[in-house]
Amino acid sequence: MAEQQKVLGMPPFVADFLMGGVSAAVSKTAAAPIERIKLLVQNQDEMIRAGRLDRRYNGIIDCFKRTTADEGVMALWRGNTANVIRYFPTQALNFAFRDKFKKMFGYKKDVDGYWKWMAGNLASGGAAGATSLLFVYSLDYARTRLANDAKSAKKGGERQFNGLVDVYRKTIASDGIAGLYRGFGPSVAGIVVYRGLYFGLYDSIKPVLLVGDLKNNFLASFALGWCVTTAAGIASYPLDTIRRRMMMTSGEAVKYKSSFDAASQIVAKEGVKSLFKGAGANILRGVAGAGVLSIYDQLQVLLFGKAFKGGSG
């Protein structure tokens, strides 16, 4: 077999991995301010309970104003480093496990039928997601804690953590390794729910809407993909809220006993709508990330003749 042509002087898979990382870093860094606002709004009740926030945010705009006023504009990128670093081990693990899980659960839609294919897709996605999460979950935990580490008005403007390493050090000291994995269960459930809804909705709607001239229309496909992504994201958002609220209790005296206990307490004390706090910012983040990535893809095509795709999430 002929040797594959090198890209940027490197083997193709190495170039894809590294340049994909640059794409991910650009996308995540561009959307980081919206991501931090989303996390602050989403987890504000845990911050109030821990005495790290004096009053609730009155929506996304109020959170943005107060955060920039109290901490400065650059604080909007707090926690972004951990989020960017997380891309590389996640992608490496995806390369390692992707083929293995595809062989285990790889049904073909036209041969085995839609439902077998869908079940295999959910099983492989859930298994691959859970396996990757085992290795990178602590980085997502650290990112969440740093992003929600607002300068406490009640505690003289002090932060709880002094950077990424400090999050690990303090969490392990107070809660052990288990503290870094709080909320792991709902995270895996969220992957399965999201994938199930995404593929289920996309496969159901595409043959109905994308017909005739729209069948191979890029904008129509992009719009449908974005709508389905948004719908799946909103539907699985409560699981994201539950896992992050559980993360926020590491190092605190009172913790949720389980994901069910967390959901029950949140709904009982704050109402169902609390499970969707920050969902609006999450949609904006998706738009910002996709927009920047589209522009960056075009630049890569101009410079290198191809676009290198970065990971999401």
Swiss-Prot record:
Keywords (A to Z) from UniProt:
Antiport, Membrane, Mitochondrion, Mitochondrion inner membrane, Repeat, Transmembrane, Transmembrane helix, Transport
Question: Main localisation, per the record?
Answer: mitochondrion
Function of this protein?
ADP:ATP antiporter that mediates import of ADP into the mitochondrial matrix for ATP synthesis, and export of ATP out to fuel the cell. Cycles between the cytoplasmic-open state (c-state) and the matrix-open state (m-state): operates by the alternating access mechanism with a single substrate-binding site intermittently exposed to either the cytosolic (c-state) or matrix (m-state) side of the inner mitochondrial membrane.
Top-level taxon: Eukaryota
Q: Look up the record and give one Gene Ontology term from the biological process aspect.
A: mitochondrial ADP transmembrane transport
- The keyword Signal appears for this protein: no
Catalytic reactions of this protein: ADP(in) + ATP(out) = ADP(out) + ATP(in)
Q: Where are the membrane-spanning stretches?
A: 13-40, 81-105, 114-134, 184-205, 219-239, 279-299
Q: What is known of its domains?
A: The transmembrane helices are not perpendicular to the plane of the membrane, but cross the membrane at an angle. Odd-numbered transmembrane helices exhibit a sharp kink, due to the presence of a conserved proline residue.
Tell me, what controls this protein's activity? The matrix-open state (m-state) is inhibited by the membrane-permeable bongkrekic acid (BKA). The cytoplasmic-open state (c-state) is inhibited by the membrane-impermeable toxic inhibitor carboxyatractyloside (CATR).
Binding locations of ADP: R86, R98, R243
Q: Which family does it belong to?
A: Belongs to the mitochondrial carrier (TC 2.A.29) family.
Pfam families according to UniProt:
Mito_carr (PF00153)
Subunit composition? Monomer.
**Gene3D superfamilies assigned to the protein according to its UniProt record, in alphabetical order:** Mitochondrial carrier domain
**What are the recorded GO MF terms, alphabetically?**
ATP:ADP antiporter activity
Motif Nucleotide carrier signature motif extends across 243-248
The protein in question is named: ADP,ATP carrier protein
Ranges where the record places region Important for transport activity: 243-248
A single cellular component GO annotation: mitochondrial inner membrane
Q: Where are the Solcar repeats?
A: 11-104, 116-208, 216-302
Membrane topology, as annotated: Multi-pass membrane protein
The subcellular localization recorded is: Mitochondrion inner membrane
